[in-house]
Amino acid sequence: MSKTYLGVDIGGTAVKLGLVDENGAVLRRAERSVSFDGYKTPILDTVQAAIHEFLTADTPRLEGIAVSATGQIDSRRGVVAGTCGNFPGWIGVDIKGTLERAFGLPVTVANDANCMLLGEVWAGAAKGYTDVIGVTLGTGVGGGILTGGRLLEGARGLGGELGHFRLHALNGVACTCGAIGCYERYAATTALVRDAQKMGLDAPDGRTI
């Protein structure tokens, strides 16, 4: 019988859940907002509530939980090491330890853009390639780099952070990371909403656009 895993994607707007088999097929999925009350509820509390609701009585036995999370992730410890200011109260959160205690399953945690890249290499558009660059566009902008078949994480887990290379260093838009003119401030959903509203459009969020 095929092994089943729980995939959890924690983004700046929502947490997405999926039951996934060992071949990468998604058996069931769900989504819940993490910003529904302006982040007053701790993000990991929302994530745990979503998982409890998602795991019904007929859920197959799980082998483990794999978490892709926004921010600078210490993948060895499963802890959030840093953010660029998009996600309040996120730095220092022990995702791995908290979820292992709550659900009694082994948990692996990595940066969301790196997970996207590895997923594409494993079972998607980049299957069979050893040198790949991937870019994620969402609440923020993320990136992952595979070179020679190895993921480039860097000493601090920032090796693929493409959202923070600077397009307009002298007179650009201020970024939440503290720099000026980062790519994220022009390409992310938040940037599109900002620009649409400046044009007088009714655009409360990215889904509307």
Place the predicted regions along the sequence by residue.
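Short glycine-rich, Thr/Ser-proximal phosphate-binding strand/loop in the N-terminal lobe
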Residues: 2-45, 49, 60, 79-82, ...
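Short glycine-rich anion-binding loops that position phosphate/pyrophosphate groups of nucleotides
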Residues: 13, 70-73, 138-140
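Glycine/GP-enriched mid-protein hinge/lid loop-to-helix segment characteristic of carbohydrate kinases
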Residues: 18-20, 28-31, 38-42, 100-102, ...
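Short, small-residue-rich loop/turn micro-motifs
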Residues: 21, 69-73, 169
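Short coil-to-beta-strand
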Residues: 21, 63-67, 204
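Glycine-rich phosphate-binding loop and adjoining helix at the ATP-binding site
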Residues: 36, 40-48, 52, 61-65, ...
